[in-house]
């Protein structure tokens, strides 16, 4: 037999961005509780609004199933006394398991006999277990939490009511003075209390009180109303998943309405208007069918269609004040030059241990010019780098960016173009912040890519030099994001930048300018390890086998695009027939070459058989061709060496008693191993 179970946590309004994650957490905790208590059920449904987190468990068993449990006790030698009677240890074990001594048996495990018992456990009634769900509710954790009243519980918002029902029965427990009942609360202004007679009545009972408890249904209702308004007004209201998710969790009974603002505000940059509407007011901007921004907005009311005109006028008044402020800020920004803005950066501290923004920009300029040298950029390009790095943070002191920090870079581009900067420089000001997330859009220009890499690497290494590094989940300065972004850009452009050398030079530069809390060698090693770990994430994103990732990172990690190419090529051919014997042959070369003593050079005059000469000749050809070979051709060249290597080992005793011959043979293998190890640490690849 089974019944439905309903658990609702009624709260003061939660922040919209935490509603979905909170109800999913509740679902998981209840699911885990059911499994831990071995209570069978059919399905769990979740419901949520800004004022409630709810789970409805369908067809929950009325009692636990009876089960057979086994338990291991003391070893036989301890369980029996000298006369073969049960010892105190055995009797104590039987008592603890609530069985009679005659129920004890022996079982052998790895040659040792132990007491074992097998007992039937009668399942408890579900109603006897359900009150312990109180601990499930109180154990929830949130990104933000608070105390209220005199209780000790920290929660996302104060708990105002609780429902816990198994069928028609109320499951009694209390949290912070709030007792469970079968009564919920409807919409704050339109609804009244709702009595729940059965858990399955819950959605309909709340709908009668103007609460759509199903978040998906609320979202769908908003989308349908938006599409209806689009058709009616011949507008275009662009899809915005983040904004839609937020407004869905801001309301309990959604009604879409439109408002207007003065056309003169359309003279503001489009990004300012859209950000004001979306980020500050949670409004949807409106566009024409041709994609032009129109002087209208759409918002979602938490209520019905009554007095919509009044509500629209109120929203218009609020937006008008916001846009008036934005227009004032914009006009004030237009009064100052870029150079005047740049001068203010010397008064803004980037970090107390790393100086001002001006000092950071000077360091980034050095890094960017260094990278340009590696990439063989022309003098004209370097002049653009110098101008760009002299100004690229200037918009941080503008009024608009002060009000709308998310527009940094975007406004820099706008203002730079208005003041006559080269379009390439203006674009790079915007692009240097990219990517803004792990999968975010990358810079599309060479100059923007270069400055983004330089800025991110300088930030990363600067913080490492002053011993500020990510720990666990804590990364307040976004260093993981900086590293990941820099490497994604390098990969996307296919730039063969020697990362180990670049890291070393940036560390030396940072230390020369005062960032000296850690020894240089330690910082270089830590940064290399940190970047290798970010590389692992990139390679995992390409679905590369873990052993191949270990192999290529253990090889030459210097040039990122080449490393990724090597990983992809190895991964692609890992199932080929020739792959296993090739890897085994190359691994054998590398392992034996470790016995090489430095300083010995290969002398062909000491070769004693044709196999030594053949391996030497092919190695010489490989050395001559290697730099010009593609990654695929390099792997093919190694594969072609396999039969030669096998023949060499079958007919040549490397570790001979003759030291001169032994050292000569090790020197030959060492030279070959240097090419193999640069490609990958072959012994990390699993070919069994």
UniProtKB/Swiss-Prot annotation:
It catalyses: tRNA(Gly) + glycine + ATP = glycyl-tRNA(Gly) + AMP + diphosphate. One of its GO terms (molecular function) is arginine-tRNA ligase activity. The keyword Protein biosynthesis applies. One of its GO terms (biological process) is glycyl-tRNA aminoacylation. Keywords: Aminoacyl-tRNA synthetase, ATP-binding, Cytoplasm, Ligase, Nucleotide-binding, Protein biosynthesis. It is an enzyme of class 6 (ligase). SUPFAM superfamilies: HD-domain/PDEase-like (SSF109604). It is found in: Cytoplasm. Belongs to the class-II aminoacyl-tRNA synthetase family. Tetramer of two alpha and two beta subunits. HAMAP family: Gly_tRNA_synth_beta. This is Glycine--tRNA ligase beta subunit. It comes from Listeria innocua serovar 6a (strain ATCC BAA-680 / CLIP 11262).
